[in-house]
Amino acid sequence: MSTSDHDRLLIIDFGSQVTQLIARRLRELNVYCEIHPFNLVDDAFLDAFGAKAVIFSGGPSSVFADGAPMPPASVFERGVPILGICYGQQVMMHCLGGKVERGHGTAEFGRAYVTPTAQKLDMLQGWFETDQDREQVWMSHGDHVSQIAPGFEVFGTSPNAPFAITADTTRHFYAVQFHPEVHHTPNGARLYENFVRLAGFKGDWTMGAYREEAIAKIREQVGSGRVICALSGGVDSSVAAVLIHEAIGDQLTCVYVDHGLMRKDESAQVVGMFREHYNLPLIHADESDLFLGKLEGVSDPETKRKIIGGLFIEVFEKYAKEIGGADFLAQGTLYPDVIESVSFSGGPSVTIKSHHNVGGLPERMNMQLVEPLRELFKDEVRALGHELGLPASFIGRHPFPGPGLAIRCPGEITREKLDILREADAVYIDQIRKHGLYDEIWQAFVAILPVRTVGVMGDGRTYDFACALRAVTSVDGMTADYYPFTHEFLGETATRIINEVPGINRVTYDITSKPPGTIEWE
């Protein structure tokens, strides 16, 4: 089965930072969906895509702005269900004859509560069933709908959004002012479940199906060509490598680049596992002197990422020539990598940081990219890894960034700081495993801070580095909360690091959520 054989849901992106979460909620329901920016969706695109239903995302724009993001008018004439979210609701009302007003004292940002009207709606099955007869939602809007379009009725209200939930049940158009995709709308998943049920989706998107489709796509793209795979030992690149090897066998050669930025003993573990257990063709390229030399004296995080991305390509091109010339470069790029790096014209999703798999790559490349995981979220990659037979202990490893410890070492990178960081990180992860917490945490690591602090050890004065412990819980990496360690755990861990790691005399714990922070420090 190819992706064209699935029921297809189109998400038209108007620039929301959380559009990918809409896709994630739909994937959890085994629905195949794609996200496309509004400015690339026209009548010809709609004809070719063949959507069974459409969702309008939120976005930062106002329908009053010059050149405001809008869908093609014909989308409302195709006889398919449409769900508008936040700005998507305002667009729907604006296009269909309703009215939107600027937010003067009616803006809502954050938690709000929606109460039902007397009318019943299939779309709200499972909502408003508690004793309080209201639902917590997450609002983020300035403008608001002041008059609904002809054919629509009101099914839910909030203090500052009298048309919080509206629907035209004849045409199966639904519109909500809040964001059901975020975790701050606890019952939001039920709305998506109801929407795809009413639209008649079969729910046939699974990782078993994706595996077969991806293998077919890889074979079609690569043909008889050779592929060189960037193997880091992380879950993403490892699943990509095993998937590609299953598709094309020894046309694949993996290159493990030791850039001097890996965790303690990681290089030996990765090389041993893939050579001995998976029997993958693997080149171990120790290029640590090259990378650390180019990074010497560099403090800016974006510059670090771009240097690392550029050097990766140089190294891969060099080893591709040594193995007889590879036509393709494989990477474990994921959906969140792309959404945090791409800003499309006219629907300004703000670029947060470049990723070494995406924005850090130079324009000049002598190989085509193979990115079989580009459409997947992290938990889908893990499910795919299970389908491919990778060990559960390996699939459950925490994410590790391509630039490695470079972005956990704010400021200038030195070999001394990297050695200290490796030891501190090893102690921290050992503590987490010892307390049985590893699988409860999405990602945990140590960052070594670019400051030295005064301390006292025994009768002597110390002047050593401070470090920050980081641990977060998340579903997909798009949003995250800090993990609530006990004070006893933090005290025990800090004591171990200070006693066992020369060069550290102060330990802090980072309790910043995402947003406003990012998971990594750089």
Swiss-Prot record:
Pathway(s) per entry: Purine metabolism; GMP biosynthesis; GMP from XMP (L-Gln route): step 1/1
Pfam family, one: GMP_synt_C
EC number: 6.3.5.2
Keyword Hydrolase: no
Leading EC class: ligase
Residue ranges constituting the GMPS ATP-PPase domain according to the UniProt record: 205-397
Binding of ATP, residues: S232, G233, G234, V235, D236, S237, S238
InterPro entries according to UniProt: Class_I_gatase-like, GATASE, GMP_synth_C, GMP_synth_GATase, GMP_synthase, GMPS_ATP_PPase_dom, Rossmann-like_a/b/a_fold
SUPFAM superfamilies: Adenine nucleotide alpha hydrolases-like (SSF52402), Class I glutamine amidotransferase-like (SSF52317), GMP synthetase C-terminal dimerisation domain (SSF54810)
Molecular function GO terms recorded: ATP binding; GMP synthase activity
Reactions catalysed according to its record: XMP + L-glutamine + ATP + H2O = GMP + L-glutamate + AMP + diphosphate + 2 H(+)
Membrane-spanning ranges: none
Entry keywords, A to Z: ATP-binding, Glutamine amidotransferase, GMP biosynthesis, Ligase, Nucleotide-binding, Purine biosynthesis
Active-site residues, record numbering mapped to chain: C86, H179, E181
Alphabetical list of HAMAP family matching this protein: GMP_synthase
Record text on subunit structure and interactions: Homodimer.
Protein name listed in UniProt: GMP synthase [glutamine-hydrolyzing]
Organism: Roseobacter denitrificans (strain ATCC 33942 / OCh 114)
Lineage: Bacteria, Pseudomonadati, Pseudomonadota, Alphaproteobacteria, Rhodobacterales
